[in-house]
Amino acid sequence: MLKTISPLISPELLKVLAEMGHGDEIIFSDAHFPAHSMGPQVIRADGLRVSDLLQAIIPLFELDSYAPPVVMMAAVEGDALDPTVEQRYRQALSTQAPCPDIVRIDRFAFYDRAQKAFAIVITGECAKYGNILLKKGVTP
């Protein structure tokens, strides 16, 4: 066990976070995301909410400052977003510094980004449109 590292972060996830370079992207997905068919390494975090994992990793993870570092999936036309999902994610991401703007992209653009991601973390999150992408920045 390591000090000051949240027990929510598995050894596998900690290794992936350490291996990522600046500009690499990681997806924290809801339980329904088709992660295994996307291609990148898949890490299971069953039973955990995305917001809890975000809060756990953000002290260890520098967000990109040159490109939009936080991306979420936009609602499909005719569908509605639950604003509390983004609020929870913003709150989790702002524990170390102000949360950057969250960019919304359509579902298929998000899938394209997921296929190129360094890894996808499947959580137990059940919120609709509960997927979020983080782009790693340069550690100061």
Curated annotation (Swiss-Prot):
Protein name, entry field: L-fucose mutarotase
By its UniProt entry, which Gene3D superfamilies does this protein fall under? RbsD-like domain (3.40.1650.10)
The chemistry this enzyme catalyses reads: alpha-L-fucose = beta-L-fucose
List the catalytic residues. Answer: H22 (proton donor)
Q: Which GO terms describe its molecular function?
A: fucose binding; L-fucose mutarotase activity
Subunit notes for this chain?
Homodecamer.
Transmembrane regions: none
Localization, per the record, is:
Cytoplasm
EC no.?
Answer: 5.1.3.29
Record-annotated residues binding substrate?
D30, R107, Y129, G130, N131
Q: What is this protein for, i.e. what is its function?
A: Involved in the anomeric conversion of L-fucose.
Q: Name one Pfam family in it.
A: RbsD_FucU
